Structures are given as structure tokens and as C-alpha cells.
Amino acid sequence: MDRAPAISSVEELLSVALDMERRAAARYAELARRMAEREHDALADLFTRLGRLERDHARFIERRLAGRLLPDPAGQASLESIVFDEASVLTPRAVLVAALRSEERAKALFERIAAAAQEAAVRRLAVEMAAEEAEHAERIAAAMQGLGD
């Protein structure tokens, strides 16, 4: 995705972010479960913590939007999910690489939204969201370093 979605209000941005946070929380919960099944306890713990962060972000956004009618985020922004079918090789490195790419795409999306934003409040919020995604990516990158080669 090279273009930023057209986001003209804080509510639109929060709607997109809420959808992304909910999907990420579910994705990380699934990855935590799968890593625990394979006895990769450190990764299961990492994905559990990331899932908790994403759920916390979603709850924060929900509180901020309390009672407001939200625009439908469909078509405004989408990120590829981390998708592994049962036949996929779920090596620790492969899972971490996929998770890192997902966080980097989310960061890049928010950076593009910030760069294209006409409204200062949208720009500030998108910059904050990009920074949060960067923090998630840093956690994943640190876990990759811990794997060695």
C-alpha cells in the first residue's frame, strides 16, 4: 500500500486504528496459543504480552470513542494479517519475521496517514500511533536477536 487512506477526522483514524488493534490482538492470541503448543514458551509469552498491549490499545480507543457513531473502516486501510495455515512451518524465526513485518506495515501506514493529514489533530494522533507500532516492532526485533542464527 503506497497511498495513505483518506482520513479526514480523528474519529476516522480511531475507527481504522480500532479495527487494526482488534485484529492484531486476535492474531497475537492465536500465535501465542500455537507457540505454546510447540513449547516455544518465550515466544508464547511475547505474543501474549503483545496481544494484551493491542487489547489495551483497543479498549483505550473504545473509551475515547464512547457513544460516537463510527465510520466504517472497511476500504480505508487494510494490512495483511499474519496468516499461517495448519500446514505452515511455524518456526520461531518465521513467526517473528511475519509479526515484525506486520508491525512495520502498521507503522508505515500511520506515518503515511500523518504525512497526508490535513488536520493537525489527525497528524498528531497518527504520529503517536506510528510510535506505538515502532515499540511493538522493537520488542519483536529484540526477540529475534535472542534467537541467534
Which residues are covered by each model-predicted region?
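Carboxylate-rich helix-loop segments that flank metal/cofactor sites and access channels
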Residues: 59-94
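Short, charged, intrinsically disordered terminal tails
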Residues: 142-149
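Acidic/His metal-coordination segments adjacent to aromatic residues that form catalytic metal sites
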Residues: 2-17, 80-100
